[in-house]
Design a protein with these regions (language model features):
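Bacterial N-terminal signal peptides that target proteins for export
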Residues: 2-13
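N-terminal cap/lid segment of alpha/beta-hydrolase-fold proteins
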Residues: 27-39
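Active-site-adjacent mobile loop/cap segments within catalytic or ligand-binding domains
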Residues: 166, 190-248
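Active-site beta-strand termini and strand-to-loop segments that position acidic
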Residues: 47-51, 205
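Bacterial N-terminal signal peptides
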Residues: 11-22
Length: 248
């Protein structure tokens, strides 16, 4: 195991302990188990704000277990109030087994970000895409959640490139987030078959899903900035004065 995986695993275990301890009641969020991993760890959704809010934002802290810095953003989001006029949905990780082990894939070795039902194809190696689309309990849990909740904006945190992946379609939301977090907006050129965000943008073209690639080394200042960027973006998009003229 590499040093990065060891460190990711140790940090991830600490975050998982916080999340599984039922701490939501102490921070004003509702906690719901939306599924279980291969190794039967709970996949946890925290919600805050009003279900009748004008904007619904989903934040996923980690889908790759060795890219867990986004979970620090989600933890910080959970310690504060939801942005005004926003229902905030937070899933710290859909891959708790990978986070605990410090591995990209789940306990079956499947890259969950190659397991969604959009342009899926069989892949091997480190991007093993599973036996079929949605073959994994973790990706099925995320898929069910998104179909049920239909978020207006979804932010998927990754590492380590230090950029915002410019999504297909209207890039306004991702561009604004790029400005707020001070990371460049770049179109990643790979095909990325079976990716979660591309499935969302294809299936729900009126909403926006985009990837935030945090750098490999993330300090507390960037975590604070990332948290503030999520809150500011949601506040801007939910503002009646702004939202009427802003494409998502």
């Amino acid at each position: 195991m590499t040093r990065r995986k060891r460190l990711s695993g140790f940090a991830g275990l600490a975050l998982l302990a916080f999340l599984f301890a039922g701490s939501a009641s102490a921070i004003g969020a509702n906690r719901q188990v939306i599924g279980h991993s291969v190794q039967d760890r709970p996949i946890v959704l925290f919600t805050s704000g009003s279900p009748e809010a004008s904007l619904k934002v989903l934040v996923v802290g980690a889908i790759h277990g060795d890219e867990a810095a986004g979970m620090r953003v989600t933890r910080r989001l959970l310690t504060g109030p939801a942005p005004r006029r926003t229902e905030l949905l937070v899933v710290p990780t859909i891959n708790p087994d990978g986070v605990a082990a410090g591995t990209r894939g789940n306990a079956h070795g499947v890259d969950l970000n190659r397991n969604f039902p959009f342009r899926w194809r069989p892949l091997g190696g480190g991007e093993y895409s599973g036996a079929s689309p949605l073959s994994e309990p973790e990706s099925r849990a995320a898929h069910r959640l998104i179909l049920r909740e239909r978020p207006d904006v979804t932010i998927w945190f990754h590492q380590p490139f230090g950029l915002i992946d410019r999504p297909q379609g209207n890039p306004f939301t991702a561009r604004r987030f790029s400005d707020l977090i001070d990371l460049p907006l770049v179109r990643l050129r790979g095909p990325y078959p079976g990716s979660a965000s591309r499935w969302q943008n294809h299936h729900f073209p009126q909403s926006t899903a985009f990837v935030v690639e945090l750098p490999e080394h993330v300090n507390r200042s960037l975590i604070k900035q990332g948290t503030a960027a999520v809150q500011a973006l949601a506040s801007e998009l939910a503002s009646p004065a702004l939202a009427a003229g802003l494409p998502r």
